[in-house]
């Protein structure tokens, strides 16, 4: 039941992520090398917002669709005594998800332009942007709605504070690590 719930929420924001990536690839002259992207938030503001929403949901940011399933899986894993190794591996996997999501956002939208092909703005094409906006809405509201539909009785899990905040702690630490690594690479490349 929990796996199906996670599959549904994950499918919604992952589909949004892939559609946004497709729009960026199409708009950047069909190049798929992320190093040639950079600064695309100026040309694709709506896609930037939608893709960041999907990334945040993938990372399990509270009150987005991914939070409801991912947090429940983490809490259930912490509740059962599977051993410290399994918990550590799970938290490392959560951290790696945040690392590559932040890297994707930085290289595509924040970082310097990588010198790829010319950018053709295609956000005015409603056949491309329409599904992205609809999936963005589902990434916002599908977590609680699917949770209420899948679990008629609320799932209450009692954990010690350090386990309850463990996932968010690892997410925050991995975010700081990624930002510092990006800063080091940027200063090494241009400094």
Can you name each region flagged by the protein language model?
Residues 1-35:
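Alpha-helical multi-pass transmembrane bundles of energy-transducing inner-membrane proteins
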Residues 36-39, 119:
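Beta-strand segments within the central parallel beta-sheet cores of soluble alpha/beta enzyme folds
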Residues 35-36, 46:
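Active-site helix/loop module of the DD-peptidase/beta-lactamase fold
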Residues 30, 46-191:
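Specific lipid-exposed transmembrane alpha-helices and their immediate membrane-water interface residues
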């Amino acid at each position: 039941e929990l796996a199906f719930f996670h599959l549904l929420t994950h499918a919604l924001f992952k589909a949004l992520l892939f559609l946004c990536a497709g729009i960026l690839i199409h708009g950047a002259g069909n190049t798929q090398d992320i190093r040639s992207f950079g600064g695309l938030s100026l040309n694709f503001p709506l896609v930037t917002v939608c893709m960041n929403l999907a990334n945040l949901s993938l990372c399990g940011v509270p009150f987005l669709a991914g939070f409801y399933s991912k947090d429940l899986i983490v809490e259930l894993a912490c509740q059962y005594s599977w051993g410290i190794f399994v918990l550590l591996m799970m938290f490392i996997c959560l951290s790696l998800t945040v690392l590559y999501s932040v890297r994707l956002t930085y290289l595509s939208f924040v970082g310097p332009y990588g010198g790829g092909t010319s950018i053709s703005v295609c956000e005015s094409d409603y056949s491309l942007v329409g599904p992205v906006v609809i999936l963005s809405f589902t990434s916002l509201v599908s977590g609680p709605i699917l949770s209420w539909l899948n679990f008629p009785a609320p799932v209450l899990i009692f954990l010690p504070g350090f386990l309850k905040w463990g996932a968010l702690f690892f997410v925050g630490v991995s975010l700081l690590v990624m930002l510092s690594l990006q800063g080091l690479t940027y200063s090494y490349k241009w400094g």
